[in-house]
């Protein structure tokens, strides 16, 4: 007696393809991309005015973003932000990529500026707390005027003790900020420079 073998059909796990034979993106992928474009549009709306001018936006997107910034009504703004997202989805891939690059560049510069401001604030606190900190600072920033630094530190301490407006406290911040210059040469670098100078004279 022969036994019949039951053949079960197995659903294909391969991704769907369109009429041209290309893989269709999954629904979850499409949803994720829509969300990312919506976030990109929201980031553009939140940019400062001067930064927004540097963004490579097509005219339609530029108009939509500026309108969203102008609207103050909560519900009206929400609808406009959604519209910005729809405009974002109509952009070419290269247009979206250019916007991401410009935003990444802006955010990178912004982070660097913030980090520098924090460094200036920490340096000011060190200078006000420890006299030896000025010597270290001058060694690392040879372009800074040490006499001006001492005067600002002394006056900033005095105005703090007397509860006066922080005029010299702010001026000390600017002095530190403007002190950047070429780093001081190490001993070996100085020796190399002297050797080069001697060689030039002997030539």
From Swiss-Prot:
Question: Does Membrane show up as a keyword for this record?
Answer: no
* Transmembrane listed as a keyword: no
Please state the protein's primary subcellular location. cytoplasm
**Which UniProt keyword terms apply here?**
Cytoplasm, Ribosome biogenesis, RNA-binding, rRNA-binding
Q: List, as start-end ranges, the regions of compositional bias called Acidic residues.
A: 188-203
Gene Ontology cellular component terms for the protein in this record: cytosol
Localization recorded for this chain is: Cytoplasm
GO biological process, alphabetically ordered:
assembly of large subunit precursor of preribosome
Annotated Gene Ontology MF terms? ribosome binding; rRNA binding
Q: What does this protein do?
A: Member of a network of 50S ribosomal subunit biogenesis factors which assembles along the 30S-50S interface, preventing incorrect 23S rRNA structures from forming. Promotes peptidyl transferase center (PTC) maturation.
Q: Which NCBIfam families match?
A: PRK05255.1-1
User: Its family?
Assistant: Belongs to the DarP family.
Q: What is this protein called?
A: Dual-action ribosomal maturation protein DarP
Classification from the root reads: Bacteria, Pseudomonadati, Pseudomonadota, Betaproteobacteria, Burkholderiales
* Annotated gene: darP
